[in-house]
């Protein structure tokens, strides 16, 4: 007979997943130069459990990435309504005053996604400037633009999501949605494999890869407990790993 997973075990699993996601982002930015290069690498800063919202943040000179990491306990795919209620409230807290730095607000989950409508809407907002009155800028004539339990206009869909998320500031909510992305079916084993593949490029011996990953996970967990920030290069340096 299989024992049911307890709430405490889910809590630990969620913390481990959060740390692994943050670590994978950090080591990839520094060691894998396919996406980022030059001085960007030096300035990459990671923050776990930032006070402003999200589970972790990666700050780079050209952009900021805020991610909310969620494990799925019921086996069901994430719907727009569930994302609006369980994910977006924390992400909208991370919206800053318009400082000109593009920000990606991401859901990362081990569950499946069933939120194409939400992602399509987010892409539409991204292509539009934030209006002085966001609600008036959204179309309200086509009453069958988006399906959310029932058919809604573009404006109605925005208002429904905003209400579900408990958001009060339409401008802040728009900026968050315009940068929203979702990545599903991200499992711990996949993250560990990605981290190990990157670490294998800089460790002295291949058999040291897993040990170094465990060391980095421990350091990241301490960082999360303190809500602190560290440059990705400094984190690797503390573990005796070169970043170039």
Please give the residue ranges for each predicted region.
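Acidic metal-coordinating catalytic centers involved in nucleic-acid phosphodiester chemistry
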Residues: 1-13, 69-244
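Catalytic centers of nucleases
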Residues: 11-12, 18-86
């Amino acid at each position: 007979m299989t024992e049911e997973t307890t709430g405490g075990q889910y809590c630990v699993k969620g913390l481990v997943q959060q740390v692994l996601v943050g670590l994978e982002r950090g080591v990839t930015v520094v060691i894998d130069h396919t996406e980022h290069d030059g001085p960007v690498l030096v300035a990459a800063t990671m923050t776990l459990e930032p006070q402003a919202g999200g589970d972790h943040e990666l700050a780079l000179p050209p952009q900021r990435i805020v991610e909310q990491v969620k494990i799925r306990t019921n086996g069901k795919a994430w719907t727009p309504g569930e994302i609006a209620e369980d994910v977006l409230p924390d992400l909208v807290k991370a919206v800053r005053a318009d400082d000109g730095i593009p920000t990606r607000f991401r859901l990362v989950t081990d569950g499946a996604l069933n939120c194409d409508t939400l992602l399509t809407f987010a892409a539409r907002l991204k292509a539009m400037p934030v209006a002085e009155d966001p609600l008036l800028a959204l179309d309200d004539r086509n009453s069958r633009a988006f399906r959310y339990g029932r058919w809604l206009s573009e404006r109605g869909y925005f208002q429904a999501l905003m209400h579900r998320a408990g958001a009060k500031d339409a401008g802040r909510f728009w900026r968050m949605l315009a940068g929203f992305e979702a990545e599903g079916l991200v499992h711990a084993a996949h993250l560990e494999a990605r981290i190990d593949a990157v670490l294998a490029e800089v460790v002295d011996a291949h058999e040291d890869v897993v040990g170094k990953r465990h060391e980095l996970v421990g350091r990241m967990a301490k960082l999360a407990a303190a809500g602190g920030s560290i440059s990705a290069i400094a984190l690797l340096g503390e573990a005796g790993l070169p970043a170039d």
